[in-house]
């Protein structure tokens, strides 16, 4: 047996360079590069190995472990899970900062490789710097916190363990049904230890991502249910994007006159202008999609997890009559909602169903077009909301008085409505631009209002809805789409939570654009607490003497080296967007908007929340009673 003597870290980097993916006839490297923040736990091991020979790996220095991991997640998601970045961190706090990002990747089923350093395998210097001591077991370290948020987790305490661990990790990351974060913790002393590795371990390794075909039984069962239905409904999830099923979805929808609705993950799988596309459904859905959902007698899930936001906490559909066909590569997801499961690739399944349904037509007739036209009229109205200091009724009604709205207008020096600003952006940026969002009220506005006309240009992280993903993720978008303009659509709350990778983007001349909506508060949660009978309690950004906080975010960005703009009108926003396109550096547009001017929920948008059963507030009592009434019509599981 021929061997090569390498340190554990050198063997790791050599192996990463030899991993390839084969998908739809194309072959390419799976690992694009590696993000790092070096500390004493990884700088002398992985750091030295990369300095010595990174191979084809692109190496970037991050500014926050969670932030750079979110960059890697966004890159993989935008590349349809066909390429990844690895992440190396030091032990202790550096590793702990990966927990939130790992959970984000797991919730969204996105493959990334996490390589946190660990405590000493020999235990000779224990407790080493940044190691805590747990009395119940000396073997427990910070990295154990990553176990529940990793699809695969391992700890390397001997150099030879690396081989079986890496093979297993890549099997998991390249499996469409169970893709997610793989975490390999490497003891910091072991990173530098050498071993005589079998050279065959470093040969080119190709991971085949094949399309799983549906069985004849699955196709017949699905076709029979569709033929019996009168008002079927397509629910397009993220799996439809990863399957690149656009043409198959359009053909199926057109041939059988079936309306198409979208989850956050599925939006932009099919362009918004497609005649049968009714937009997002559920809690943050359009009026058109939710009406169609309530009338459906068969729901055909295409690569969706059917989260509470898609099903309105399992109250959106008429569960007394509706049936489900779930097409999903994941057996677990396909079995949800008592569905007839088709565990197969979305594109291939839809293509196979079309000839089996010859002669079938839904009974919608012109209803789909009428629903869409009704919604487009409402969308147009939302794009023209203007503020009035005397008689203004915001979209979120009954929360703030006119006096409070005027106070915000004065403090933020704006009369700009959020929906007007958002639709102005949609109309002004290039159609092939890619937008990203994750948390706050903006995801709801985007799912309802944003029209994506180019496939895979709408990037929402709504599996974990992690505040702070937006700016970090925009850098990931730019790495995936270097020739397109990329935009973070982010609220002030999420921006404050995490925006460190804006500096990384500036450092490496990777132009990103940050569109920062500032309403001085956690507006989404403020709506929530007040909708359910509470007061406005610690969700507005107010000073100790109750003054509204006014932050100059444009100046913050200028300090980092970005080109920045301050806007509070349609004209200023359009001018800033056009000028930002001309810039070669990263930009930030500080958009001051009024609170309560985001979209509100439409018919069918109820959300099951933990409302207090006992309260002295009448509003909370009524909210609890409504919850109990809604649950009588909800599916229990």
From Swiss-Prot:
Record carries keyword Lyase: no
Pathways involved: Polyol metabolism; myo-inositol degradation into acetyl-CoA; acetyl-CoA from myo-inositol: step 3/7
Region of interest (Thiamine pyrophosphate binding), residue spans: 441-521
Organism domain of life: Bacteria
Manner of cofactor binding, per the entry note: Binds 1 Mg(2+) ion per subunit. Binds 1 thiamine pyrophosphate per subunit.
GO MF term set: 3D-(3,5/4)-trihydroxycyclohexane-1,2-dione hydrolase activity; acetolactate synthase activity; flavin adenine dinucleotide binding; magnesium ion binding; thiamine pyrophosphate binding
Annotated PROSITE patterns: TPP_ENZYMES (PS00187)
Co-factor requirement: Mg(2+); thiamine diphosphate
Catalytic activity: 3D-3,5/4-trihydroxycyclohexane-1,2-dione + H2O = 5-deoxy-D-glucuronate + H(+)
Top enzyme class: hydrolase
EC annotation from Swiss-Prot or TrEMBL: 3.7.1.22
Binding site for thiamine diphosphate: 65
Gene Ontology terms describing biological process: inositol catabolic process; isoleucine biosynthetic process; L-valine biosynthetic process
Residues that, per the record, bind Mg(2+): 492, 519
Family of the protein in this entry: Belongs to the TPP enzyme family.
Function as written in the Swiss-Prot or TrEMBL entry: Involved in the cleavage of the C1-C2 bond of 3D-(3,5/4)-trihydroxycyclohexane-1,2-dione (THcHDO) to yield 5-deoxy-glucuronate (5DG).
Protein name (record): 3D-(3,5/4)-trihydroxycyclohexane-1,2-dione hydrolase
Gene: iolD
């Amino acid at each position: 047996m021929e061997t090569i003597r390498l340190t554990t870290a050198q063997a790791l980097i050599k192996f990463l360079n030899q991993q390839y993916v084969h998908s739809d006839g194309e072959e390419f490297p799976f690992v694009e590069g590696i993000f790092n923040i070096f500390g004493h736990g990884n700088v002398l091991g992985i750091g030295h190995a990369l300095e010595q020979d990174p191979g084809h790996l692109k190496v970037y220095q991050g500014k926050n472990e969670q932030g750079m991991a979110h960059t890697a997640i966004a890159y993989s998601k935008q590349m349809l899970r066909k390429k990844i970045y690895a992440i190396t961190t030091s032990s202790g706090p550096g590793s702990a900062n990966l927990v939130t990002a790992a959970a984000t990747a797991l919730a969204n089923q996105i493959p990334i490789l996490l390589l946190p350093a660990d405590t000493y395998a020999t235990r000779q210097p224990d407790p080493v710097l940044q190691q805590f001591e747990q009395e119940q077991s000396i073997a427990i370290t910070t990295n154990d916190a990553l176990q529940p948020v990793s699809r695969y987790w391992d700890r390397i305490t001997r150099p030879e363990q690396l081989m079986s661990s890496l093979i297993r990790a890549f099997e998991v990351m390249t499996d469409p049904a169970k893709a997610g974060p793989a975490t390999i913790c490497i003891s910091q002393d072991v990173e530098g230890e050498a071993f005589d590795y079998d050279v065959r371990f470093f040969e080119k390794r190709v991971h085949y991502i094949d399309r799983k075909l549906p069985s004849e039984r699955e196709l017949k069962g699905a076709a029979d249910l569709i033929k019996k239905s009168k008002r079927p409904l397509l629910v397009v999830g993220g799996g439809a994007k990863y399957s690149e099923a656009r043409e198959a979805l359009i053909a199926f929808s057109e041939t059988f006159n079936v309306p198409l609705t979208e989850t956050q993950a599925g939006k932009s799988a099919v362009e918004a202008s497609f005649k049968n596309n009714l937009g997002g459904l559920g809690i943050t859905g359009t009026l058109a999609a939710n009406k169609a959902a309530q009338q459906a007698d068969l729901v055909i899930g295409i690569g969706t997890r059917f989260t509470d936001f898609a099903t309105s906490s399992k109250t959106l559909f008429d569960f007394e009559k509706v049936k489900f066909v779930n097409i999903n590569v994941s057996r677990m997801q396909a079995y949800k909602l008592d569905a007839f499961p088709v565990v197969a690739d979305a594109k291939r399944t839809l293509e196979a169903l079309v000839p089996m349904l010859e002669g079938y037509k839904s009974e919608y007739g012109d209803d789909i077009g009428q629903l869409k036209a009704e919604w487009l009229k409402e969308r147009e109205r939302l794009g023209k909301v203007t503020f009035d200091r005397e008689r203004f009724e915001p979209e979120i009604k009954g929360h703030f008085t006119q006096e409070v709205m005027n106070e915000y207008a004065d403090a933020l020096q704006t009369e700009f409505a959020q929906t007007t600003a958002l639709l102005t952006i949609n109309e002004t940026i290039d159609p092939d631009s890619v937008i990203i969002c994750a948390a706050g009220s903006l995801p709801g506005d985007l799912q309802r209002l944003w029209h994506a006309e180019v496939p895979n240009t709408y990037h929402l992280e709504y599996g974990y809805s992690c505040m702070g993903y937006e700016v970090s993720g925009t850098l990931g978008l730019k790495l995936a789409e270097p020739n397109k303009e990329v935009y973070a659509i982010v609220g002030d709350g999420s921006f404050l939570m995490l925006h460190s990778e804006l500096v990384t983007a500036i450092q490496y001349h990777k132009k990103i654009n940050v569109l920062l909506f500032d309403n001085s508060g956690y507006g989404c949660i403020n709506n929530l607490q007040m909708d359910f009978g509470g007061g406005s309690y610690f969700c507005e950004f107010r000073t100790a003497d109750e003054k509204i906080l006014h932050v100059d975010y444009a100046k913050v960005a200028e300090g980092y080296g970005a080109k920045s703009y301050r806007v509070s009108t349609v004209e200023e926003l359009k001018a800033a967007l056009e000028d930002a396109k001309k810039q070669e550096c990263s930009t930030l547009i500080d958009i001051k908007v009024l609170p309560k001017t985001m979209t509100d929920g439409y018919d069918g948008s109820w959300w099951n929340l933990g409302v207090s059963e006992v309260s002295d507030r009448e509003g909370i009592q009524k909210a609890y009673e409504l919850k109990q009434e809604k649950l009588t019509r909800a599916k229990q599981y």
